[in-house]
């Protein structure tokens, strides 16, 4: 059975993920380093890790299995999860899989270097209603694909 892991500390699509998880009956882990409100559901479990750099990321990367779904904007975490066979979605609905993760890592590193040199001083664009809609569609697609792949792997 596929599961969903949310890198929850700064995730703008937690509520949308909860709804999709409930509709599909998927166990969901909401992982953060602080208390985050979650719906009362036997399918949704809050995991509060200790404070520290990448502690939540480490927990997710160690628990995730092939065919699971991870919601995160953290590209290095995404790379770790993809290496374990998981499907990763960022909050804007971009699917980060084996085909896309290399380019995503390269772009992240380039942008980090440009920010460090002062060539880029602005943040990214704001999160929109269209982003939310794209995410919902991508998550539904990821669930269907994950179930098919898990069934084929049996």
Swiss-Prot record:
UniProt xrefs under InterPro entries: UPF0178
According to its UniProt record, what is one Pfam family this protein matches?
Answer: DUF188
Instruction: Name the HAMAP family for this protein.
Output: UPF0178 (MF_00489)
Family stated for the protein in its record = Belongs to the UPF0178 family.
Q: Which NCBIfam families match?
A: PRK00124.1
What name does this protein carry? UPF0178 protein GDI0551/Gdia_1457
Organism of this sequence = Gluconacetobacter diazotrophicus (strain ATCC 49037 / DSM 5601 / CCUG 37298 / CIP 103539 / LMG 7603 / PAl5)
């Amino acid at each position: 059975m596929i599961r969903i892991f949310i890198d929850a500390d700064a995730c703008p699509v937690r509520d949308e993920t909860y709804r999709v998880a409930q509709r599909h009956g998927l166990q969901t882990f909401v992982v953060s380093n602080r208390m985050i409100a979650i719906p009362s559901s036997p399918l949704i479990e809050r995991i509060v890790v200790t404070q520290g750099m990448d502690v939540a990321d480490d927990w997710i990367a160690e628990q995730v299995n092939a065919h699971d779904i991870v919601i995160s904007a953290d590209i290095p975490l995404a790379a770790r999860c993809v290496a374990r066979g998981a499907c990763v979605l960022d909050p804007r609905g971009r699917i980060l899989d084996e085909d896309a993760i290399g380019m995503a890592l390269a772009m992240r590193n380039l942008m980090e270097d440009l920010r460090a040199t002062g060539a880029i001083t602005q943040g990214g664009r704001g999160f929109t209603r269209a982003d939310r809609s794209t995410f919902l569609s991508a998550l539904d697609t990821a669930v269907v694909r994950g179930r098919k792949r898990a069934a084929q792997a049996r």
